[in-house]
């Protein structure tokens, strides 16, 4: 990322605060090529490819400007027009350039703020994935109600471009960006389908992720302001906040107006115990207070998405549930709060009392059905969870095959060690072990029994022990109480930077 600063400083010397000239810089597409190559460990470095050259980009942009995008028919075939047969290929080139160019100024702002130790106050509550797990354990047992919310999707890309315009002032750049988005999939209509959004996100992941993150950041900035000022808000006054262009300029004035008009205390509308957690496109809203306040926030969310982001969201899509009666899914786990009831006998003099004690315990369970569905999609088992042999390359060695299965098994064990019940995790590990054995037996054109007899089943299966299991098995006997206690306890590892790939298929 350090080279970004050099390139932007070079461009700033020519034109202040403009991103459009960077689109026509050769080094931008050199960075795009380097980024694409570094994402995969299976690709060989064949040098700087001609497809990322500046000459190709200029030709594509020239053809885009020559098209009359105002009369594009919604029934035009994607194979027609200026894209020709290389539509996806050409769009990826420009998309990578757009993504890198728009990332540069925001990365520089972030790096400068970190160097000066200036953390933006409005984002002081932003945490990494590490904080979500202890949050569930420490806070959720004291809460009563929860809303499992999926951020509305899809959203029209024009809204995403408008959000970006509030932060970057460069009309030619956004004109070219709109032209690219309209030409890509005929997004000049009023309705954006999930299929078109999915196609764009897969073929242009970096640009789509950047635009989508901006959308989430914008919605959360408004939500945090509403949360901080919730004691002065009423639902009928919510539309005042939806003029986003002058939002920051009006914010202080609005606070003064609310303090003047609603000077009497409104403790009934305050909700200091509300908690908000988000990861990717899903968020959890939990509270200890009465459902009325949760219902208020539910309508805030719906009006925000409908009035400001033009995303239709119906009230019935957001349900308010009691934690003791509802399980919610987050980060690949099924979580709920279980009530443990116990009766204690108390005696005072000659009188005996029975006291019922209710304690709450957080249950975090590995979702077996979504994981089996993901393993079946990856050809490790069938839809019923029966292990099958996975097709491999003929020149793959036994060591490479075993190492590939071991990596997947250890990653899953590492990620799901925080579960309170590991029975489902052991089943997933069993599927991977047996699938590995069947794959090796199929490669050697042998049966599973004959292959295990020849290679030694015990040594092969012990390869699937995680590093923690290997260390503890050397310290404690296999049947010791300490080792069994280790298997039962939840352990969160701090080196988890993102959710497992199989979790993203949920």
UniProtKB/Swiss-Prot annotation:
One example of a Gene Ontology biological process annotation: tRNA processing
InterPro entries hit by this protein: Domain_X (IPR024937), Maturase_MatK (IPR002866), Maturase_MatK_N (IPR024942)
Single GO MF annotation: RNA binding
Subcellular location: Plastid, Chloroplast
GO CC terms, sorted: chloroplast
Pfam families noted in UniProt: Intron_maturas2, MatK_N
Keywords, comma-separated and alphabetical: Chloroplast, mRNA processing, Plastid, RNA-binding, tRNA processing
The family this protein is said to belong to: Belongs to the intron maturase 2 family. MatK subfamily.
Protein function: Usually encoded in the trnK tRNA gene intron. Probably assists in splicing its own and other chloroplast group II introns.
Protein name: Maturase K
Species of origin: Trifolium incarnatum
